[in-house]
Amino acid sequence: MSIERKVQNETGRNPYRIGANVLLLVAFFLLFHPLLSRGSLMYQPTISHWLTAGAFVPLVLRPWRRNHPFAENHTRLYAAVLLVHDVLLFLSAAAVSLILVEYMVKGCVITLKQSFFQGWICYVAVYAAAYLICGNVRIGVCLGMAISMIHGMIDHYVMLFRGTPVMLSDIAAIGTAANVSKGYSAPIELSVLRAAAAAVLFCVSVCLMQRSFKVHKRWYFRRLFSLPCVLVLAFIAYTGIQTVGTGLAFWQSSRQYSEIFYFLRCATSSFVKQPEGYSADSLSDAQSEFTGKQGTKTPNLIVIMNESFSDLGSVGALETNEDPMPYVHKLMQGQENTISGQLTVSTFGGGTANTELEFLTGDSMAFLPYNCSAYQVFIKSEMPNLTSGLDSLGYQTAAIHPYLSTSWNRTNVYRFFRL
């Protein structure tokens, strides 16, 4: 028997594996610790120290193997030690996921302590759910970390290209995103590589833990234990923001919140509620206020929407050596037979179909979930709109778009709108 094998049998530890663990921990520390000096945490050294300790304690305090004298003589106590270690490991992994995702998306750590702990609770729920599915600590950590990193990378590139975070309603827009993404290039940035490398090192360190003793061998016991934890954490994540007396401000940037918390809270607001005071009687009363004579002329109606066109001077002082839009400004200054004005839309950084919806139907996006795609989520049948009665007046209607017809579900929506 070799000396290394003899040492392993007597001590329960493989010296080569211990050396690999040390190297992994050093590499993880060099990648992870500098991230804590990003953002406001650099002004909160106490939090930085606690986070560092929290990330490394479960990795350093490894449980003994079963053939260790303590484990053999105190089986129940050792099982309790393993359980505590597993809980610490999940809490640590949740903090690591939060910091890596925030750094990947924002380039820094979120600014508010309250927002940090809200996001941390959400990630703890994710890891508890992962353990509920697989019933294995190592696989649960790797699965939870993979979910976190995938969400972080998607959010990173959505923010890069669109300027707004990914939402649950974006799932319905995957086809449109695939069409649009053909015109973009996705650079592999240092923040993504650094976060991914730290996540891999953390997972490898967890997988190399020497452990042959299980807290409980029966799979249904593990799931029965983790199920209430998931439910409690989900309840805390859902209602916690009201408990502390704050609210989610959709008009504010997601930089005020952690990415996971912002995503989940927006997802819970993705259900349409009937506006206050809305009824058929109220609509009839509003309609009765508008009277007029039936027109006899049937002019051609042409509507052009150009999402890349805007008068930048209307939102601030724009100094140029010559007027960039002389004809447009001439029309807006009272040209004969011209009615002009400025249009304010509810979309930013894309979402042109929502502006189409507001124009064609007169319905406001204010009553729909924030940042949703109404064409893809809510328009499932014919809906009254500007073109609904034109066929009875002898008009023929058509819609022309210069890009793929599958984007924003326009093929079906235009059919529902009789275009």
Model-derived features: positions:
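PLP-dependent class I/II
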Residues: M1-S2, E307
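Transmembrane and membrane-interface helices of multi-pass
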Residues: S2-S254
